């Protein structure tokens, strides 16, 4: 049974009649690319695309970047095109 004190912050879980455990909920942030005045996803903008690529050169998943599914697909396609056109490296060198 979950009892919610503050729906977005904490909840108390009661397991039988034993001890109560606190369960913390984090409110999911909105998509940073869906807000007004957000930058346009374009393969010619490597400064934006590099923010969504890991240190090793892999594309970061949407659960880490908080990007919605529609924008994540556009990002992935833009990163792939930028790599083919040599605007982004396929693999980043270890420093």
UniProtKB/Swiss-Prot annotation:
Matches recorded under Pfam families: Ribosomal_S18 (PF01084)
GO CC list: cytosolic small ribosomal subunit
Subunit structure: Part of the 30S ribosomal subunit. Forms a tight heterodimer with protein bS6.
Keywords associated with the record: Ribonucleoprotein, Ribosomal protein, RNA-binding, rRNA-binding
UniProt key word Nucleotidyltransferase: no
Gene name of this polypeptide: rpsR
Name of protein: Small ribosomal subunit protein bS18
Function noted in UniProt: Binds as a heterodimer with protein bS6 to the central domain of the 16S rRNA, where it helps stabilize the platform of the 30S subunit.
GO molecular function, one term: structural constituent of ribosome
Gene Ontology BP annotations: translation
Family: Belongs to the bacterial ribosomal protein bS18 family.
PANTHER family per the UniProt record, alphabetical: 30S RIBOSOMAL PROTEIN S18, SMALL RIBOSOMAL SUBUNIT PROTEIN BS18M
């Amino acid at each position: 049974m979950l009892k919610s004190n503050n729906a977005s912050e904490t909840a108390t879980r009661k397991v039988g009649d034993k001890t109560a455990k606190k369960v913390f909920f984090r409110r999911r942030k909105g998509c940073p690319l869906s807000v007004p005045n957000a930058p346009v996803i374009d393969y010619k903008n490597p400064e934006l695309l590099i923010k969504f690529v890991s240190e090793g050169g892999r594309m970061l998943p949407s659960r880490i970047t908080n990007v919605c599914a529609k924008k994540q697909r556009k990002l992935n396609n833009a990163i792939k095109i930028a790599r083919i056109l040599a605007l982004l490296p396929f693999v980043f060198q270890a420093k």
